Curated annotation (Swiss-Prot):
This is Arginine repressor. The gene is argR. One of its GO terms (biological process) is regulation of arginine biosynthetic process. Regulates arginine biosynthesis genes. PANTHER family: ARGININE REPRESSOR. SUPFAM superfamilies: C-terminal domain of arginine repressor, Winged helix' DNA-binding domain. One of its GO terms (molecular function) is DNA-binding transcription factor activity. Belongs to the ArgR family. One of its GO terms (cellular component) is cytoplasm. InterPro entries: Arg_repress (IPR001669), Arg_repress_C (IPR020899), Arg_repress_C_sf (IPR036251), Arg_repress_DNA-bd (IPR020900), WH-like_DNA-bd_sf (IPR036388), WH_DNA-bd_sf (IPR036390). Pathway: Amino-acid biosynthesis; L-arginine biosynthesis [regulation]. Keywords: Amino-acid biosynthesis, Arginine biosynthesis, Cytoplasm, DNA-binding, Repressor, Transcription, Transcription regulation. It is found in: Cytoplasm.
Length: 156
């Protein structure tokens, strides 16, 4: 059984590796952690850590798909890098559909869910590059679409 300090060291090393934005597979992360001296690291443990910390796959500066952590591991904000990930916002009667860059949907959905009912968002479901957002009783799809476009400073 790991002592808390070893677990904390593992989490620190894991986060530091993802900040490098160079790991395209879970196997590469396992290898890097093993090279740093951590024992009993396997793909399933890395997968659980990626989920726990909200890691997503996105393109790095070299346009490679890599694992990275959302900014500050907190609730993301609509800063310039995020707004560039939103490609299209459309709607039908009950749902607003958002298209994003590949791998960005979960990050954008997390931001939208953090805004919640005050912005007319009841909840969202995200895939790899598509988000379905459902609205509260007091909102219209047109209002919600406008709020989302305003959040990402888009005119789609």
């Amino acid at each position: 059984m790991r002592t808390p300090s070893k677990q904390e060291d593992l989490v620190k090393a894991f986060k530091a590796l993802l900040k490098e934005e160079k790991f395209s597979s879970q196997g590469e992360i396992v290898t890097a952690l093993l090279e740093e001296g951590f024992e009993n690291i396997n793909q399933s443990k890395v997968s659980r850590m990626l989920t726990k910390f909200g890691a997503v796959r996105t393109r790095n500066a070299k346009m490679e798909m890599v694992y990275c952590l959302p900014a500050e591991l907190g609730v993301p904000t609509a800063t310039s890098p995020l707004k560039n990930l939103v490609l299209d916002v459309d709607y039908n009667h009950p749902i607003v559909v958002i298209r994003t860059s590949p791998g960005a949907a979960q990050l954008i959905a997390r931001l939208l869910d953090s805004l919640g009912k005050s912005e007319g968002i009841l909840g969202s479901i995200a895939g790899d590059d598509t988000i379905f957002v459902t609205l509260t009783r007091d909102s219209t799809t047109e209002q919600l679409r406008g709020a989302i476009l305003g959040l990402f400073e888009q005119e789609l």
